[in-house]
Amino acid sequence: MPLCGSSSSSKHPIERKIVILGDGACGKTSLLNVFTRGYFPKVYEPTVFENYIHDIFVDNQHITLSLWDTAGQEEFDRLRSLSYSDTHTIMLCFSVDSRDSLENVKNKWVSEIADHCEGVKLVLVALKCDLRSSDEYGNESAITPGSIQNQKYNGGGGNGLIPYDEGLAMAKQIGALRYLECSAKMNRGVNEAFTEAARCALTATPKGARDSAPEAESSSCTIM
C-alpha cells in the first residue's frame, strides 16, 4: 500500500530506448563504455551488437535507459535494421577526425533512419573532441563550446579536424534537436550527451516497427 502523498507509479522508472548510430570506429562503443562502466577501452574491438541498461535521473525523473550499440559497417546493415523497433531517440555520432563519418551523417544515416524509424528524435554527437586540443606533448585543454568555436577551419583545417561550427551546421541541416560534443577518452561531455538524449526521449513517442501516429516535433537545434 503506497504511503500518503506517494503513488505506486513513482516506484517504477520510466523506460526509454536510445539507439547509437554512426560509422564504424567513430567512437560509439567507447562513449557507451565510459558512460555505463566508467572506463575507456584501450584496444578497438568492432561491435556487432550490444545492449546496455543504465539508470539516470533527468529533471527529477528516474529513467532506465536501454542503450543499443550498433555496428556501422556496411556488412551489418541488415542486422542493424533490427535495432530500430520502438526507439525513442537516436544519438547519431561522427568523429571529428573523420570527414567521411560526418558526410555519412547526411549521405547514409539520415536516409537509413527515414527508412526504418521515420520521425524519431535525433541528437547529433561529435566524438573524439580531445583531438582538437591535443598539443605536441599530449596535454589536453578543456573542451568547451567557446574554445571550439574559436578554432577556424581553413580548407582541411590547420589540423584536419572538423570544427564545432561545421558540426552545428550539420545538426541544423538534418533537423537534430541537440548538437553536443564530447571526449570519451577524457570523460568530458559524456554524461551531458546522454542526459540531453534522455531529456529528448522523455517526451518522445516510440518509433520504428510498431510506431504510433506521427507526433508534432520542433526541428530547431539546441546548442550545448
UniProtKB/Swiss-Prot annotation:
Propeptide, residue positions: 222-224
Compartment(s): Cell membrane
Motif extent (Effector region): 44-52
Family membership noted in the UniProt record: Belongs to the small GTPase superfamily. Rho family.
Protein name in UniProt: GTP-binding protein RHO3
Positions where Cysteine methyl ester occurs in the chain: 221
GO BP, sorted A to Z: actin filament organization; establishment or maintenance of actin cytoskeleton polarity; microtubule cytoskeleton organization; positive regulation of exocytosis; positive regulation of formin-nucleated actin cable assembly; regulation of actin cytoskeleton organization; regulation of septum digestion after cytokinesis; signal transduction
GO terms, molecular function: GTP binding; GTPase activity; protein kinase binding
Region Disordered, annotated ranges: 205-224
Source taxon at top rank: Eukaryota
Keyword Metal-binding attributed: no
InterPro entries xref list: P-loop_NTPase (IPR027417), Small_GTP-bd (IPR005225), Small_GTPase (IPR001806), Small_GTPase_Rho (IPR003578)
Protein's UniProt keywords contain Cell membrane: yes
Membrane topology: Lipid-anchor
Lipidation (S-geranylgeranyl cysteine): 221
Function: Involved in the regulation of actin polarization. Rho proteins are required for distinct steps during polarized hyphal growth of A.gossypii.
Binding residues for GTP: 22-29, 69-73, 127-130
Gene Ontology CC terms, in alphabetical order: cell division site; cellular bud; cytosol; plasma membrane
Cysteine disulfide partners in this protein: none
Keywords on record: Cell membrane, GTP-binding, Lipoprotein, Membrane, Methylation, Nucleotide-binding, Prenylation
